[in-house]
């Protein structure tokens, strides 16, 4: 009987605490702090960012900000959303607990790209003019700025966040910036002569973080890079017009979408041999994997179909038809769901990765969405 009374007291305390928390806003449905659940898509027509509930397949909130957003990133530990303001060389920081703007960052440079650091506390802005600016979101202060790169839009952090890799296409090299030393510490040549017309992708990491992959798009090859010794260890010929590679989360394969010949090259990470080239029949803009890396979704640069590739049998399945061209895709951290926006209409599509079917399609309330992001995803290589 005493134990029953104790249990009842604990339940009563829990319920009263929950009620008090609700009053204080600690359990408010307005919170958008679950980094694996909520995705964020910047409107390209309104001063807002759309929060998407990936679990329920619906719009969770419309976050109003003082400007039309450029790119966005969300942090998990700090529960913050950062939206760039390229026209004013600035960025806005929003608290996801209450959706209030808590800081406006004067960057002193145009933020053409934005990406989070692995530590979750820092955010990096890059410009086509070759400047990188790193900010501490816990203090809303700039940590340091590095200038003088050819371009600073093709950026990737190392697995632990201690290094920033900046691809410089014309020079066909990667500049390595050390976060602790706040300076460039190395340059990694990608092979070949400098070329003002060269097209090169950003670097992608293997799942373990030891190996990097860069597509030299204009030369139909990828460079395989030792990210410990900072050197190219192999150059592999792939299809025509390869874009940014993608490493599967199980570290078995590297996937290279070939834009110009509409195919997907599959490379085994252990042998670095091409194991398959699968027709996609679309001009690719990126690739994502889902359902425990058994399926790849190739997102289109144009057109209204997503290519579906079976990674167990290395063959194409029926494509997924959408009502318009899709944005980039994000895959939830449980690998079950692909989320994308329809660029021209502002609709959001939720795709079940197991069945390969659209499970939900809903209006976001804004005319155009592009650049969907989530704090915690199935993507381990970017």
Regions of interest found by a model, annotated:
Residues 12, 16-382:
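Predominantly soluble domains enriched in secretory-pathway, periplasmic, or organellar proteins
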Residues 4-9:
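Sec-dependent signal peptide recognition
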